């Protein structure tokens, strides 16, 4: 017999219940047995809070329903004493911020550390707020909402974000929404972006922000940049490259706006070559180098890395013109796969770019290589790198294995929240 609960009800299969008990936060479309109104007759509406029950009547938790999505329910609590009201979300926001306080350097801010004014404040399921991403850049929050449940909660959660930070002495006064992701169509949501003009929010004159990370400055256009603006998940990995770069000639592939390359230059690299297929990204990377006074030791090339690396291996004159030979190569490609169906193709892509990089490295040289897709597991990435090493006839010594920064926490039971791997090797 089901216990009395205040919300409409979703009854799920035994398999779904096992998954929820193991900590996974999603109920999929095919796992729903039936849906029922609440005890008071309240019907289910898209994005509302629902109670989730196993067929035997056991309560599994409460979540937000997405009636247009294959992910039908995203869980928000397994505590039967929780009531999903404004106070509930206030606690979630406060917990998320306090975690950043602890994990990213205590109370030394503005931002998260003395040399940094940015961090990820909310990381969706990992912070108990499924469908919500919040990045903090100095005085501005940049948000991305990906579910209908969070879309409905914007008027509740946005003021809580500002209030939580301001009560902690943080100079945060504005929210910029980047709800222009095509993925919103899966939830039946429109795309839009712009300043949120709700309770307690200011509207700055410009969407440009000066981001400081690891003591380096980046001129960021939050209106037109990728996703929520800056890839904050690589912060400590960039610092690791800085520590390795002293006296070396560095090739930064898929450089975006230059954060890996600038960290290498700041770490005392003899020379850094940054490469990206986007001319806009290259121009921004060069501008950021000038902003930090590092441009004299850096060069910038607009090229397709998948073609550029083999060309350097074939043409030693071009290699010298580009600043080589290089003894540290950084590979930070975009996600090669966004679904299980393309993992095999992605593995081939990772194998090819790592093979091409290994061909350029001398004995004693270093390779820092990344993957940012949770479908490409750590084991699959290592297998692709091992295959590349075999093909290149080199032996690798693993120096370090890292993941995403701690402001992107990994929720155990939800492998989707572990998506970034960063591996450093030396050719021996």
Regions flagged by a language model, labelled:
Residues 280-330:
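S-adenosyl-L-methionine
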Residues 246-256:
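Conserved class I S-adenosyl-L-methionine
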Residues 271-276:
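Conserved SAM-binding motif I beta-strand of class I
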Residues 257-270:
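Conserved SAM-binding loop of SAM-dependent methyltransferases across substrates and taxa
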Residues 326-356:
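Mobile active-site "lid"/loop adjacent to the S-adenosyl-L-methionine
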Residues 325, 352, 366-428:
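C-terminal catalytic and target-recognition region of SAM-dependent MTase-like enzymes
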Residues 122-135, 154-230:
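Non-catalytic substrate-recognition/targeting regions of SAM-dependent transferases
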Residues 1-138:
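Non-catalytic accessory regions of SAM-dependent methyltransferases
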């Amino acid at each position: 017999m089901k216990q009395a609960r205040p919300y409409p009800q979703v009854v799920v299969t035994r398999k779904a219940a096992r998954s929820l008990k193991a900590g996974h936060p999603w109920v999929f479309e095919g796992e729903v047995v039936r849906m029922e109104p609440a005890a008071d007759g309240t019907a289910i509406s898209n994005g509302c809070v629902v109670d989730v029950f196993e067929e035997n009547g056991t309560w599994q938790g409460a979540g937000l329903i997405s009636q247009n999505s294959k992910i039908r329910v995203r869980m928000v609590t397994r505590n039967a004493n929780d009531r999903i009201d404004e106070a509930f979300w206030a606690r979630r926001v406060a917990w998320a911020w306090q975690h950043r306080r602890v994990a990213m350097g205590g109370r030394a801010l503005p931002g998260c550390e003395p040399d940094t004014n940015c961090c990820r404040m909310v990381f969706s399921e990992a912070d108990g707020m499924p469908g919500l991403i919040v990045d903090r850049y100095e005085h501005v929050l940049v948000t991305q909402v990906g579910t209908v449940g969070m879309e409905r909660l914007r008027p509740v959660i946005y003021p809580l974000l500002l209030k939580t930070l301001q009560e902690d002495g943080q100079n945060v006064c504005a929210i910029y929404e980047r709800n222009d992701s095509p993925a919103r169509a899966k939830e039946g949501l429109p795309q839009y972006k712009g300043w949120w003009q709700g309770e307690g929010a200011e509207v700055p004159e410009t969407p440009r922000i000066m981001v400081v990370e690891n003591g380096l400055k980046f001129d960021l256009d939050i209106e037109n940049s990728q996703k929520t603006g800056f890839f904050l998940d690589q912060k400590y990995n960039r610092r690791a490259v800085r520590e390795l770069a002293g006296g070396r000639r560095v090739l930064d592939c898929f450089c975006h706006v230059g954060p890996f390359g600038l960290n290498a230059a700041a770490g005392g690299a003899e020379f850094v070559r940054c490469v990206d297929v986007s001319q806009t990204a290259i121009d921004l990377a060069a501008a950021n180098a000038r902003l930090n006074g590092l441009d004299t030791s850096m060069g910038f090339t607009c090229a397709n890395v998948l073609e550029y690396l083999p060309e350097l291996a074939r043409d030693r004159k071009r290699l010298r013109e580009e600043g080589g030979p290089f003894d540290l190569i950084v590979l930070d490609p975009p996600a090669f796969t966004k679904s299980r169906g393309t993992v095999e193709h992605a593995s081939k892509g990772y194998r090819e770019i790592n093979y091409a990089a290994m061909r350029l490295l001398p004995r004693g040289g270093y390779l820092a290589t990344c993957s940012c897709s949770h479908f490409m597991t750590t084991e699959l990435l290592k297998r692709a790198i091992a295959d590349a090493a075999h093909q290149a006839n080199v032996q690798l010594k693993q120096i370090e294995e890292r993941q995403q920064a701690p402001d992107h926490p990994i929720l155990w039971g939800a492998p989707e929240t572990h998506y970034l791997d960063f591996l450093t090797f030396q050719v021996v």
